[in-house]
């Protein structure tokens, strides 16, 4: 299990979890962890791509070293896999160590992929929608009264710019364009945080081929220089998040398990 962080000070704790630490961002790190700067890389895009600069590095530089018979998983320093739901306020570093997923259960062998429990858009209060996207909702008041209309596209428009998701989808290949468009229009939830655990190297290669080809095309629309605010600066990571949920649901047999939220900075600092 690769655990991605921005803080070199987290490496020791991540290793104690029996996870493989990955340090991204601009801080210097030592040789006892993975990064995204060596070999063929896109590390300069980390501000915009988030964890996908490591996925690219892994694909281009380390993939042959991965065991074909073992699960390949990814988590983050604030988000961890578990088989049980636990509220953030009930967690500590010690409890986290005893709760997170260390080994994939044998009964999961019939699946190709593990995804996080879905994020349901309509679980957010109406006032939050109004506060974030007043102009969007006023332009189409049905968003206030029709839960069905509050789909993935609506949520992306709200958080990352009106119609940006659809513009990006138009750049997809014919094998994904229509299916992904239907997914974001018809679904009111998605598997969040760009987290997954995959059992098949060949399946993961196919995913990497599709996602990076698409994100590279999206750069021609959105670029980098004019991306302002978190929602737009990280637009490539957010596009990937929605696509990941769609792609693995379309191409694999999957199961969903909880993701625990606990920022290890709370006790380790940075």
Where are these regions (language model features)?
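ER/Golgi luminal nucleotide-sugar-dependent glycosyltransferases, focusing on the catalytic module
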Residues: 1-270
């Amino acid at each position: 299990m690769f655990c991605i962080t921005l803080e070199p000070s987290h490496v020791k704790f991540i290793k104690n979890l029996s996870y493989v630490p990955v340090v991204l961002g601009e801080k210097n790190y030592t040789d006892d962890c993975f990064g995204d700067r060596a070999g063929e890389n896109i590390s300069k895009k980390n501000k915009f791509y988030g964890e996908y600069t490591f996925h690219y590095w892994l694909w281009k530089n380390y993939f042959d070293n991965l065991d074909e018979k073992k699960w390949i998983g990814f988590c983050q320093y604030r988000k961890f896999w578990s088989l049980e739901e636990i509220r953030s306020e009930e967690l500590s570093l010690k409890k986290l160590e005893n709760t997170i997923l260390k080994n994939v259960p044998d009964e999961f062998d019939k699946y190709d992929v593990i995804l996080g429990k879905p994020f349901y858009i309509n679980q957010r209060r109406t006032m939050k929608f109004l506060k974030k996207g007043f102009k969007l909702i006023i332009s189409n008041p049905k968003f206030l009264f029709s839960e069905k209309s509050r789909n993935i596209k609506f949520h992306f428009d709200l958080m990352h710019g009106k119609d940006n998701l659809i513009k990006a989808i138009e750049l997809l290949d014919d094998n994904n364009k229509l299916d992904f468009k239907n997914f974001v229009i018809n679904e009111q939830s998605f598997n969040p945080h760009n987290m997954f655990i995959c059992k098949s190297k060949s399946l993961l290669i196919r995913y990497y081929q599709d996602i990076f080809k698409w994100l590279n095309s999206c750069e021609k629309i959105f670029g980098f220089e004019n991306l302002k605010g978190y929602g737009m600066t990280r637009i490539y990571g957010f596009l990937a998040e929605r696509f990941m949920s769609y792609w693995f649901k379309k191409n694999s047999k999957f199961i969903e398990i909880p993701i625990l939220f606990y920022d290890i900075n709370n006790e380790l600092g940075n």
